[in-house]
């Protein structure tokens, strides 16, 4: 398995453990998606289709299809991908994506869920710093794992 694929799978595993092991569905659907897309990605426009609701980003022509009962954490995940693309960074589940994901969760859901998600990333040894942030020392990493 490539390092890229392993990183993708570990990111999915961390978010799945955060939101589904706690029986969190958060089915806010379209209103949440519309609010998030409007607040975070002004270039995006919401259009409806028979399969769900499609958000179209004109910058990269990326489509996100959300059902009317999409859990809010899935909406946050997709918006984090959109924020990464707006910065012209490579797609995928890298540390900048995970940082955006935590930030969007904090804005859209609550600091509680953002904290739980960051702890899941810590448990999976997945980094989520912006590139300009200082790396943590070994002592800081150990403290984060056991706190």
Predicted ranges, named:
Residues 1-73, 82-147:
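Active-site-proximal or metal-binding-adjacent scaffold patches in catalytic folds
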Residues 78:
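Walker B catalytic acidic pair
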């Amino acid at each position: 398995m490539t390092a890229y694929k392993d990183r993708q799978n570990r990111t999915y595993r961390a978010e799945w453990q955060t939101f589904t092991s706690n029986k969190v569905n958060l089915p806010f659907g379209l209103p949440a998606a519309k609010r998030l897309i409007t607040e975070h990605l002004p270039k995006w426009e919401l259009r409806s289709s028979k399969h769900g609701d499609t958000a179209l980003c004109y910058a990269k022509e990326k489509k996100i299809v959300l059902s009317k009962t999409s859990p809010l954490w899935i909406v946050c995940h997709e918006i984090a991908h959109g924020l990464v693309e707006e910065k012209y960074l490579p797609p995928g589940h890298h540390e900048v994506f995970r940082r955006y994901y935590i930030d969007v969760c904090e804005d859209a859901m609550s600091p509680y869920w953002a904290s739980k998600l960051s702890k899941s990333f810590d448990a999976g040894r997945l980094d989520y710093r912006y590139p300009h942030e200082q790396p943590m020392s070994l002592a800081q990493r150990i403290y984060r794992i056991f706190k």
